[in-house]
């Protein structure tokens, strides 16, 4: 089955693409290569197992050049919290307007299945176990952009009968992680591999949830 994967050349997206191929699907990769890397998917494209379009999801006209597929997996986003602080308008354009463009693309192409990549960041500084009904309190522009994306997804589901799932992954780690956005596990491993002790801030008692990129990739195929 052909499946559009936005952000498919990125850290998580390239793993989703790889898993789709292993499950006999044909990914249509959409990426503007702002943070994604073509080398992550080149072997799949060269071997004819995937197709690549260098398209920015903010460009509605170019999006309409994409083929109709049974489903869309939407990962394309600015994932840096720091960038959302420094350049909130840009992050809003990509994460909010870009998501709206993808939903509208699906409506126009009559694509009913849509998976949106949200974030556990929408819960804010929540210090207890969270679930689907936990109150959302976003405290960054990035988190707010993801929650807004979820709200647009609900509207399109209600109005147009789209079958939409929103995933809320927490801190993802694993191969191909962008050095600029590397999480604490990557930074710990980099220092340990160079025979330096990891840098631990505070008293070391803070906790954080992590998930390996292979596990989150599987979640998109459930």
For each of these PLM feature ranges, what is it?
Residues 128, 151-208, 213-222:
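NAD(P)-dependent short-chain dehydrogenase/reductase
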Residues 1-172:
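N-terminal Rossmann-like NAD(P)+-binding domain of SDR-like oxidoreductases, especially those catalyzing
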